[in-house]
Amino acid sequence: MGPRARPALFFLILLRTVAAQGRPPRSHSLRYLFMGASERDHGLPLFEALGYVDDELFVAYNHESRRAESRAQWVLGEAHSQLWLQLSQSLKGWDHMFIVDFWTIMDNHNHSKESHTLQVILGCEVQEDNSTRGFWMYGYDGQDHLEFCPETLDWRAAESRALTTKLEWEVNKIRAKQNRAYLERDCPEQLQWLLELGRGVLDQQVPPLVKVTHHVASAVTTLRCQALNFYPQNITMRWLKDRKPVDVKDAESKDVLPSGDGTYQSWVALAVPPGEEQRYTCQVEHPGLDQPLTATWEPSLSNTLVTGVISGIAVCVIIFLIGILFRILRKRQASRGAMGDYVLAECE
């Protein structure tokens, strides 16, 4: 895997991981993604930042311009507001912090003469009951490296090479407290401000289109439940057998992915015994639905029609053959009857 692909893969995995960690149907999130390369050959600047609200990109920043640029229509009018200026200052501070952390990690790995990448994801989720969850994670060369634990003000090392940096950072309690203050106070406040700005856009709810399809391959029958064109991306999909939940280990699910038009899509599949398809139901929960939606597989009209036509033709052929056989038998009987009358006449 090339150096450019590693940061992208890391962020794709992190985005899915953070989004999938039990987010309730009506929670909201604010995430900042930082990335940088020590050398230009990785195709990245020394520092670049992207900000997302509920997976909607709203701000971008890089080390060369040193200014925050809006990336969404609903924040264009806030370029000179006090909160936007505070956001710009935060990004400038993170720019400096990122570079210092980058050199620290490289020094602790004795990598000062090589080209490497650093990735960071930090932010918070605010749930419907106003409870919050913060996250602050580092990746080095596309691999998990360190994760901040706000409850204990410690860092969790994802690999043994990160232990030196972990111990070094844990000595700085002032920074740890500042990190926690951001995750538990400043980040939720920023998120609420952004949600107010994006009202009518971020709070829209588009219910999913749900359908169940039927597939047979290598003697295995599979039902696939598809949810299409929904927003936001928070969705729960499960299979029921005779109205009882099926063990999630038996089902194959796909991550929620963007459709390309601002909506999302996902699916969950299940292998079922042939002939028992009607015992299984797909249940979908989404903020755009007033109540859980259920769907079952129904044979398409074309399949039913083809089956009916084939059955009809088969019946007609059978009737035709029976008719021919009946006529042959009658002719034979008639022929035998005529011969019998002729012989009797001669005897008289």
UniProtKB/Swiss-Prot annotation:
Signal peptide: 1-22
Function field: Binds to transferrin receptor (TFR) and reduces its affinity for iron-loaded transferrin.
Segments on the Extracellular face: 23-306
Localization (cell): Cell membrane
Disulfide bonds: C124-C187, C225-C282
Chief location bin: membrane
Gene Ontology biological-process annotations: iron ion transport; regulation of iron ion transport; response to iron ion starvation
Name used for this protein in its record: Hereditary hemochromatosis protein homolog
Organism: Rhinoceros unicornis (Greater Indian rhinoceros)
Region (Alpha-1): 23-114
GO cellular component terms, semicolon-separated: external side of plasma membrane; extracellular space
Pfam family, one: C1-set
Alphabetical list of InterPro entries matching this protein: Ig-like_dom, Ig-like_dom_sf, Ig-like_fold, Ig/MHC_CS, Ig_C1-set, MHC_class-I_related, MHC_I-like_Ag-recog, MHC_I-like_Ag-recog_sf
Topology of this chain in the membrane: Single-pass type I membrane protein
